[in-house]
């Protein structure tokens, strides 16, 4: 026989569980879904069996480094062929074969975003885009910055399969004549079609956070913790959280690299260590279980 207190606790848990079920469709990434499955067995079953939750698959750090072709195929299969959006950020172990397997099983994909997936090649991307273009189906978004080896010929061929040139995030840089991503500039004086700072990241120094150009004597830049010689404009550097040791911030795209410091005082501000300072201290990165 349950006591009144036990019944109240059970009712409260049911209410919490109902709220969590409502929240599930709004979760951003696979990391968040995998975190939620640990709450309860019923929630785990709901996530595993609800096809609608898997029509958008987002895999980014810290899970990216462990993603293989087989794991990608396993998770994409949970959409039962209804996958619409595939976002893989810096998934170095994903190959052309793995991506093609997902595309063949999900012919309704409209967005492929694979920045930094260096295990892919231009030929593999083109085969996937060509496969998806059958039956008058066209990709709405194709982001492939960081996939090495694209040429003008590859770009011209891709345009024939895409709904518009704006679909793809690569173009020919007017400075170096190479196929690279050319970000827009938010600086007021550069807000024109033939702006002087129009060029790729290698030709024009830019803020890693807002992409504003950092050319001219009136601009000031600060070093970021991201590595790769990334810099930030002074405005972004001032507002971004900084490593408690070296006082360098991460840009938003690399914020997952922060190693948060547990705090016991509720009045204390959250703090973190950048990767360089964290590993210098001899600690180990945390791991996330892929199992559902």
UniProtKB/Swiss-Prot annotation:
Q: Say if the entry is tagged with keyword NADP.
A: no
Acetylation among keywords: no
What role does this protein play?
A: Component of SCF(ASK-cullin-F-box) E3 ubiquitin ligase complexes, which may mediate the ubiquitination and subsequent proteasomal degradation of target proteins. Required during the endosperm development in embryos.
Question: Which keywords accompany this UniProt record?
Answer: Developmental protein, Ubl conjugation pathway
Coiled coil regions, renumbered to chain:
none
Instruction: List, alphabetically, the Gene3D superfamilies matched.
Output: Ribonuclease Inhibitor
Record organism:
Arabidopsis thaliana
Q: How does it assemble?
A: Part of a SCF (ASK-cullin-F-box) protein ligase complex. Interacts with SKP1A/ASK1 and CUL1.
- Pathway membership, UniProt: Protein modification; protein ubiquitination
Q: What is this protein called?
A: F-box protein SKIP28
Its domain comment says: The F-box is necessary for the interaction with ASK proteins.
- Domain F-box residue range list: 21-79
Q: What processes in GO biological process is this protein linked to?
A: embryo development ending in seed dormancy; protein ubiquitination
Top-level taxonomy: Eukaryota, Viridiplantae, Streptophyta, Embryophyta, Tracheophyta
